[in-house]
Amino acid sequence: MLTYETWEENNVSFSEEDETKGALSVLSWAYKEYEGEIVYACSFGVEGMVLLHLINQVNPSAKVVFLDTNVHFQETYELIQKVRERFPSLNIIEKQPKLTLDEQAKLHGNKLWESNPNLCCKIRKILPLEESLANEKAWISGLRREQSETRKHTKFINQDHRFQSIKVCPLIHWTWKEVWRYVYKHSLPYNPLHDIGYPSIGCEKCTLPVGEGGDSRDGRWAGKVKTECGLHYQ
């Protein structure tokens, strides 16, 4: 088994010349390699809809974790229910932070997402994902190279130093248009916020719509240097 510790033995390669640009092959390999020790960390963005559909074909009982920060858009929570109905056999886990919003405010002040967004992300996303990955050998992410400068070198299989794990990214070669084409082709549910200028959807407090021609991550932590929550730093 390929693990974080045995990374030097990595000799896995995949063809990108199929209909899914390698995504199904990558997922088939991952679930065979790790069996029950892999989880998909899903934010329920539009890429997530594609991956959930593909994963359901490969492993209908796969584990899916959603990092419920308690400050997501209502549309996101409604979408999760639609996904549960569309893919009832998937094991979708809504992972909560240890601190409630009230407890966080007492410790760090109100609106931590404004005063210290990095700490807010650590409490409400990074630490919960660490807990979710504690007993896993690998995790799946919907990163695409096209999304931003920080993601353009992502590979199918990555040694993830942040979580000391293997990070599997099946959609790295997909374009934004290809993602949507797949969603429409298979009549997949998606977050209606995508239709009003939100290409990337995170917490309600830190996500704004993006103007035409903007980077897909421009609406995240707008006005700050920050463009990543910290889950994908190497």
Swiss-Prot record:
Active site, renumbered: 229 (nucleophile)
GO cellular component: cytoplasm
Biological process, per Gene Ontology: cysteine biosynthetic process; hydrogen sulfide biosynthetic process; sulfate assimilation, phosphoadenylyl sulfate reduction by phosphoadenylyl-sulfate reductase (thioredoxin)
Pathways per UniProt: Sulfur metabolism; hydrogen sulfide biosynthesis; sulfite from sulfate
Residue ranges of the TM segments: none
Amino-acid positions noted as binding [4Fe-4S] cluster in the UniProt annotation, renumbered to this chain: 120-121, 203, 206
Molecular function per GO: 4 iron, 4 sulfur cluster binding; adenylyl-sulfate reductase (thioredoxin) activity; metal ion binding; phosphoadenylyl-sulfate reductase (thioredoxin) activity
Cofactor(s) needed: [4Fe-4S] cluster
Record InterPro entries: APS_reductase, PAPS/APS_Rdtase, PAPS_reduct_dom, Rossmann-like_a/b/a_fold
Cofactor binding note: Binds 1 [4Fe-4S] cluster per subunit.
Keyword Iron recorded: yes
Main location, first listed in the record: cytoplasm
NCBIfam families xref list: APS_reductase, cysH, PRK02090.1
Its biological purpose: Catalyzes the formation of sulfite from adenosine 5'-phosphosulfate (APS) using thioredoxin as an electron donor.
Entry similarity comment: Belongs to the PAPS reductase family. CysH subfamily.
Protein name (database record): Adenosine 5'-phosphosulfate reductase
Native organism: Bacillus cereus (strain ZK / E33L)
Organism classification: Bacteria, Bacillati, Bacillota, Bacilli, Bacillales
Gene: cysH
